[in-house]
Amino acid sequence: MSADVVVAIDGPAGTGKSSVSKGLARALGARYLDTGGMYRMVTLAVLRAGIDPADADAVGRAAQAVRMSVDYHPDGDRYFLGGEDVSTEIRGDKVTAAVSAVSSIPAVRTRLVGLQREMASGPGSIVVEGRDIGTVVLPDAPVKIFLTASAETRARRRNDQNVAAGLADDYEAVLAEVRRRDHLDSTRRVSPLRAAPDAVVVDTSDMTEAQVIDHLRDLVRQRSEVAR
């Protein structure tokens, strides 16, 4: 692309958001930032410190004290907590189970939103992925996209990923977790999951990853031309 552009991509888990966002960033020659990884780093720090994720005051203090950084890479960002590469550990089951509770705490979101805005303001185009990018983090982004898919489709995708990774084949348990996470994300008091009024909503239920990336690339080009 000839001009820099900021693309905000939001949506619930299991919509293909991460893989699509990475693919779109590669197609655009843009940087990529997964803001969910930052919430996972704070969650990991909280768990390592033995803090109850429901203790808002203690979690808030931990969020303010944590030292984190993100190393941009075309194949996926690397996440560093106090200088330690925790890119794999933040994707573990314990962090996954606690991240919704931690990310719902206002002090955590305040700290990370500021960091995310700083990262997005750097030179060049960037694709920023999360759950409140178009509504809170980057409300003035010229391109806002909200990915969605049925809970059943998202659970099937996640279960297939688990099986491929050698984990248990348990679709019903995964579906229950998807619905639980949806409820937590959409009803939290601070920055609930929702599409921005000017976001383009894309249902990925019946689309392949390549089809979604191609569609979003066209949307970005169209919106970028309009925004000039």
UniProtKB/Swiss-Prot annotation:
<dbReference type="GO" id="GO:0005829">
    <property type="term" value="C:cytosol"/>
</dbReference>
<dbReference type="Pfam" id="PF02224">
    <property type="entry name" value="Cytidylate_kin"/>
</dbReference>
<protein>
    <recommendedName>
        <fullName>Cytidylate kinase</fullName>
        <ecNumber>2.7.4.25</ecNumber>
    </recommendedName>
</protein>
<feature type="binding site">
    <location>
        <begin position="11"/>
        <end position="19"/>
    </location>
    <ligand>
        <name>ATP</name>
    </ligand>
</feature>
<dbReference type="InterPro" id="IPR027417">
    <property type="entry name" value="P-loop_NTPase"/>
</dbReference>
<dbReference type="InterPro" id="IPR011994">
    <property type="entry name" value="Cytidylate_kinase_dom"/>
</dbReference>
<dbReference type="GO" id="GO:0036430">
    <property type="term" value="F:CMP kinase activity"/>
</dbReference>
<dbReference type="GO" id="GO:0005524">
    <property type="term" value="F:ATP binding"/>
</dbReference>
<keyword id="KW-0547">Nucleotide-binding</keyword>
<keyword id="KW-0963">Cytoplasm</keyword>
<comment type="similarity">
    <text>Belongs to the cytidylate kinase family. Type 1 subfamily.</text>
</comment>
<dbReference type="GO" id="GO:0006220">
    <property type="term" value="P:pyrimidine nucleotide metabolic process"/>
</dbReference>
<dbReference type="GO" id="GO:0036431">
    <property type="term" value="F:dCMP kinase activity"/>
</dbReference>
<keyword id="KW-0808">Transferase</keyword>
<dbReference type="GO" id="GO:0015949">
    <property type="term" value="P:nucleobase-containing small molecule interconversion"/>
</dbReference>
<dbReference type="InterPro" id="IPR003136">
    <property type="entry name" value="Cytidylate_kin"/>
</dbReference>
<keyword id="KW-0067">ATP-binding</keyword>
<keyword id="KW-0418">Kinase</keyword>
